A protein has these predicted regions:
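A glycine- and small-aliphatic-rich helix-loop capping segment at beta-alpha/alpha-beta transitions
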Residues: 115-116, 150-151, 250
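Short, composition-biased local secondary-structure segments
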Residues: 110-124, 140, 186-197
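Short, glycine/charge-rich beta-strand/loop segments that flank catalytic centers
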Residues: 56-58, 131-140, 151, 165-169, ...
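Nucleotide 5′-phosphate-binding alpha/beta core
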Residues: 1-99, 103-123, 127-128, 360-365, ...
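Hydrophobic alpha-helical segments that mediate membrane insertion or helix-helix packing
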Residues: 100-101, 132, 151, 260
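Conserved AMP-binding loop of ANL adenylate-forming enzymes
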Residues: 122-158
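Active-site glycine/GP-rich loop and adjacent strand/helix microenvironment
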Residues: 1-30, 154-416
Length: 416
């Protein structure tokens, strides 16, 4: 059995980086030429100079909220439903269009393995000639189609089970005897538990590719005890495959078709290796050429290489959401404001705003990592008032003492 999907998975890291950076400059030029929205976002950028991670980090981050706002504005004006982000139009070049919550509309091009999920399926043990039970939703959103495209590219046959109708799904599994499952881990557990209650035979399921929600080790072990090896994948409707789990069970390996950065929430500034931050993705997809797309998800880079021999960077997986906006005394405070305050104090390593107290009696405390210095707390408090229009206490703490969890705003209020 072939262990790796292709030679890219084991190429030298320097070789991969050189290829990605060469592709990056071409991708930026294509985005400017083919995507009106990206052309506006990247106005004045010389694509030929965007050939390094440092250069990429100087470009603006486009977050999901901005993508939605641009689509809504375009639709209100009777324009492009995709808000100018798509580089393809209806017809032969666009196989399907989808609606994700918002709604945000996404196009699907015609390339085989369009979402690049065949790589994740291969790492999870799926192979040509197998039957897969796809329990992701086939209704409006692209979830089911994202993994189906990868399964078909591998040479698998797909049963489009969709969601719900547990009894009918159990009957189909018992009679069709699929080799593997695609869907959320929680629904797989429901199927297995219902099968045990009903005496249905689901023993043909030996592997699973799960996504859409967290799959804690306890659930993975529970499934393993019942003969199902479950592997996580990190994919979105905007980006396709971002990262996937391997047999090593040590984080998720990045896909070969994306450039991933981990940035401080609310900014576009890359964090140090190992520090938790927002996942920002540049998707090398000519049909939907996103550059520095902010997913809103938190993760961190894992040091070292995957024990399986795959040489691409690994991340820790999904660690929560980066959108930490809090409403304090009737005013919104967001991560971008925290970043703006920090920029005024180069001597401050990190800071966290902790909002505590009961509802209608909010208390703001800024925990600031810095060496003691005369007047620093007072100057920091003044900057906070200037940026947020709110008063708060400032507490200086030792460098490195704040948790490495990606949070810059912590809502610790009681909502009882």
């Amino acid at each position: 059995m072939k262990e790796f999907f292709d030679a890219l998975e084991t190429c030298a890291p320097a070789e991969r980086e050189a290829a990605l950076m060469a592709a990056l400059a071409r991708h930026v030029a294509h985005a400017q030429a083919a995507s009106p929205a990206m052309a506006g976002i990247l106005a004045g950028v010389d694509a030929g100079t965007i050939a390094s991670r440092a250069a990429l980090a100087r470009l603006p981050v486009t977050r999901k909220s901005e993508l939605l706002a641009r689509q809504q504005a375009a639709r209100a004006a009777g324009g492009d439903v995709f808000g100018g982000f798509a580089a393809i139009v209806r017809g032969k070049a666009m196989r399907r269009a989808y609606a994700s919550p918002g709604p945000i509309y996404e196009p699907e091009g015609t390339a085989a393995n369009y979402w690049r999920t065949a790589r994740a399926l291969h790492a999870a043990g799926f192979r040509a000639g197998e039957l897969v039970h796809n329990a992701f939703s086939y209704h409006m959103t692209p979830g089911a189609f994202i993994v189906e495209a990868g399964a078909l590219a591998l040479g698998c046959t797909v049963f489009p089970a969709g969601t719900g109708q547990t009894e009918q799904q159990l009957q189909a599994i018992a009679e069709l005897r699929p080799d593997g499952y695609l869907g959320t881990p929680s629904f797989l557990r429901i199927l297995v538990e219902k099968a045990q209650e009903a005496g249905a035979d689901v023993r043909s399921l030996r592997k699973a590719l799960v996504s859409g929600e967290a799959c804690p080790p306890s659930l993975r072990d529970w499934l393993g005890e019942r003969g199902i090896q479950a592997y996580q994948t990190y994919a979105t409707a905007d980006c396709g495959l971002i990262a996937y789990e391997t047999a090593a069970r040590e984080g998720l390996v990045l896909d070969e078709g994306v450039i991933v950065e981990i940035v401080r929430p609310g900014t576009g500034d890359p964090v140090a290796e190992g520090e938790v931050g927002e996942v920002v993705v540049t998707v090398l997809n000519p049909d939907y050429p996103l550059v520095r797309f902010g997913t809103g998800d938190l993760s961190a880079v894992l040091p070292g290489a995957c024990p399986t021999g795959r040489t691409n960077t690994r991340i820790r997986g999904w660690l929560g959401r980066a959108d930490q906006t809090a409403k304090v005394r009737g005013m919104f405070v967001h991560p971008g404001q925290v970043a703006e305050v920090l920029k005024r104090f180069p001597e401050v390593a990190r800071a966290r705003l902790v909002v505590s107290g009961a509802m209608a009696n909010d208390r703001m405390t800024w925990r600031v990592e810095a060496a003691p210095a005369p007047g620093l707390a007072e100057r920091f408090a003044e900057a906070v008032r200037d940026v947020t229009k709110l008063r708060g206490e400032v507490e200086l703490v030792a460098p490195g003492s704040l948790p490495n969890d990606g949070k810059v705003i912590e809502d610790a209020r009681s909502y009882q």
